[in-house]
């Protein structure tokens, strides 16, 4: 915000500016100390900021005599101070009532994800010594002196001791029962299994902090209360064991104007005690072919650290779809390309594959490679499909778990790469080259027509004898024509805005309908049309020809549009100039307004015709067809070029680009 010279500013504006600067200085200090958990100091800063906010708001800036850019800027500052005052008061009330602490302190109070196991020496002790020695340790794990461990009843209920030969089981890993399982950390004995932690450990599941602690403008877009696990990858490529299933939520801040002031992102992802800021088109996210979502670990200062998020198969399908849709909107989500290499499938830490098993034909990717290597992100792929096979159970009941089996990333597909018939490519290239030539010819023809109109008008003016006395045009008529020009111009702009809105809605609806039409429409096509005797897809060849036809029609339509504008501009300009030459300046100006009004009326009528329900349905169907044909458009340069100086398809497309550059800049109105 630019500041005017203070010598000419009223005292009230100076007071408002001073209060504005001091208020936000104290509010920012309060936010910083609040994030560090220093409540009392944060409350003092908030109170000082509220005092300056009230002082700045108390100045009356809406008086009738207070006009000008300086007062307008002061009113904007007061409006911002009012909004900030409401948020600061709400946060101060929360701090004074002790309802919540800062988000970071809440996350530090989450119970430990990994309990402390009893020492291995306990296996060598007698049952009597076991019951006495393990009680304090279990009480320490539980975090409180539970009756089962410390009370008198805890000693008689001594549990069997595991044999020293029994190996310790690996940390908890992701399994098909992740939504309900992983709430026991146990080790086997001769008579069964028993938990190494108390019941309180299972009851005290981590819960997300209250949404009120984030401010009044925080909006929770999705909350999955349980069934989400995370694992960590360090710069050396080592992968940690997955965490216990916990909650996941995505929060968005509604007031974007405060993002810069409060130094916060537009939204964030929270999985238990891990946070990740979400900035549209900037926050990188990789969806692996094995179903895990990989994020850079921004909570650690070290570079090369990553976090994987795994959703349980027991979660509703709607939750998974909503989660991925939100990631597409609020981050830069990429899909991992298929890796056609024979290597071990993705292994959850703690599960080992057995060398006796035959190698699997899989295209899975180790998460350490996919997360630490930037080359694994496919920049252009939107259809990454997984072709992995399921893990097998061995005789000792240890199971190799493949995440792609549990959380499908994309529906598996066994389709081979589609080969197009030669005739389809030839026809498509001929259509595109022909359309480019037609468009170029239309524009060039319009240019020659415009020059002919100019020459003809010049010769006509040479034969016309100007009037000795310019024609007097009534001021009322001149004023009426000018008003008509302005009114029709406004109507044309408004109708164009309405048409743009209808087109935007139709485009969105068409893009949403296209995948469903493609999915269900392919089921209606007979197999005989999908493949010919040579194994080539005749249907895909027809789709390529159709896509090229659409491209060619668009090119010709642009040429027609450009040619029409060129001719209309020349006719209008020469008509006005001829009338001005014959009847004087006033008559020429009236003619100019009348011609512009007629053009505006025509554009308005054309736009209104494209606003109705029928036009909406047409545009939706057209956009659906265009979206279906996007995958079949020819974008590569053809390898065969005719000899003898013949122009290739790519060269003709360059001519089409020149057509766009040669459009006259003095166009009246754009349809």
Curated annotation (Swiss-Prot):
Ubiquitinated; ubiquitination does not require ITCH and WWP1. GO terms for biological process: adipose tissue development; BMP signaling pathway; collateral sprouting in absence of injury; lipid catabolic process; lipid droplet organization; lipid transport; lipophagy; midbody abscission. SMART domains: MIT. Residues 384-393 have a biased composition (Basic residues). InterPro entries: MIT_dom, MIT_dom_sf, Senescence/spartin_C, Spartin-like. It holds the Pfam family Senescence. The keyword Lipid metabolism applies. GO terms for molecular function: lipid binding; ubiquitin protein ligase binding. This is Spartin. The senescence domain is required and sufficient for lipid transfer.
């Amino acid at each position: 915000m630019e500041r005017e010279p203070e010598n000419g500013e009223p005292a009230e504006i100076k007071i408002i500016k001073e209060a504005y600067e001091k208020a936000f200085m104290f509010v920012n200090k309060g936010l910083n100390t609040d994030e560090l958990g220093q409540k009392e100091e944060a409350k003092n800063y908030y109170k000082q900021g509220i005092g300056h906010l009230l002082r700045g708001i108390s100045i009356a800036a809406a008086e009738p005599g207070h006009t000008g850019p300086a007062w307008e800027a002061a009113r904007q500052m007061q409006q911002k101070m009012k909004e900030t005052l409401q948020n600061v008061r709400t946060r101060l009330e929360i701090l004074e009532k002790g309802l919540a602490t800062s988000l970071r302190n809440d996350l530090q109070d989450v119970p430990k994800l990994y309990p402390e196991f009893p020492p291995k020496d306990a296996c060598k002790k007698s049952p009597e010594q076991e019951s006495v020695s393990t009680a304090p340790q279990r009480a320490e794990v539980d975090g409180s002196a539970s009756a089962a461990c410390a009370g008198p009843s805890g000693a008689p209920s001594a549990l069997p001791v595991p044999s020293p030969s029994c190996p310790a089981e690996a940390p908890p890993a992701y399994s098909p029962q992740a939504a309900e399982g992983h709430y026991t950390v146990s080790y086997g004995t001769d008579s069964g299994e028993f938990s190494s932690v108390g019941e309180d450990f299972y009851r005290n599941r981590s819960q997300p902090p209250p949404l009120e602690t984030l401010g009044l403008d925080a909006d929770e877009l999705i909350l999955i209360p349980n069934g989400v696990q995370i694992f960590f990858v360090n710069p050396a490529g080592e992968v940690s064991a997955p965490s216990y299933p916990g909650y996941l939520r995505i929060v968005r801040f509604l007031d974007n104007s405060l993002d810069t002031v409060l130094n916060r992102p537009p939204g964030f992802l929270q999985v238990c005690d891990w946070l990740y800021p979400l900035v549209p088109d900037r926050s990188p996210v990789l969806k692996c072919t094995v179903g895990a979502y990989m994020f850079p670990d921004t909570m650690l200062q070290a570079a090369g650290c990553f976090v994987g998020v795994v959703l349980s198969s027991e979660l509703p399908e709607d939750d998974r779809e909503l989660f991925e849709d939100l990631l597409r909107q609020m981050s830069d989500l990429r899909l991992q390309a298929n890796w056609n290499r024979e290597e071990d499938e993705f292994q959850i830490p703690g599960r080992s594959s057995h060398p006796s098993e035959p190698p699997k034909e899989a295209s899975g990717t180790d998460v350490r490679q996919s997360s630490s290597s930037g080359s694994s992100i496919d920049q252009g792929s939107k259809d990454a499909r997984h072709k992995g096979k399921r893990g097998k159970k061995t005789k000792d009941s240890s199971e190799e778990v493949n995440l792609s089996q549990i959380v499908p990333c994309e529906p598996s597909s066994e389709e081979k790469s589609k080969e197009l018939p030669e005739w389809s490519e030839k026809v498509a290239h001929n259509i595109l080259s022909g359309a480019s030539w037609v468009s170029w010819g239309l524009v060039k023809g319009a240019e020659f027509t415009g020059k002919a109109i100019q020459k003809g008008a010049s010769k006509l003016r040479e034969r016309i004898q100007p009037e000795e006395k310019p024609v007097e045009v009534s001021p009322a008529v001149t004023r009426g024509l000018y008003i008509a020009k302005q009114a029709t111009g406004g109507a044309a702009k408004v109708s164009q805005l309405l048409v743009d809105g209808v087109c935007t809605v139709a485009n969105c609806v068409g893009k949403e309908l296209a995948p469903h039409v493609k999915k269900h429409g392919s089921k209606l096509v007979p197999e005989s049309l999908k493949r010919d005797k040579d194994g080539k897809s005749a249907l895909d060849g027809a789709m390529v020809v159709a896509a090229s036809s659409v491209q060619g029609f668009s090119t010709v339509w642009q040429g027609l549009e450009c040619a029409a504008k060129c001719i209309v501009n020349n006719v209008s300009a020469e008509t006005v100039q001829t009338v001005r030459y014959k009847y004087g300046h006033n008559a020429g100006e009236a003619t100019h307004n009348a011609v512009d009004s007629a053009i505006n009326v025509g554009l308005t009528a054309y736009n209104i015709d494209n606003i109705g329900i029928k036009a909406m349905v047409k545009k939706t169907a057209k956009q659906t067809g265009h979206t279906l044909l996007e995958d079949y458009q020819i974008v590569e340069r053809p390898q065969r070029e005719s000899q003898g100086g013949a122009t290739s398809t790519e060269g003709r497309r360059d001519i089409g680009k020149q057509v766009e550059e040669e459009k006259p800049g003095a166009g009246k109105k754009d349809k």
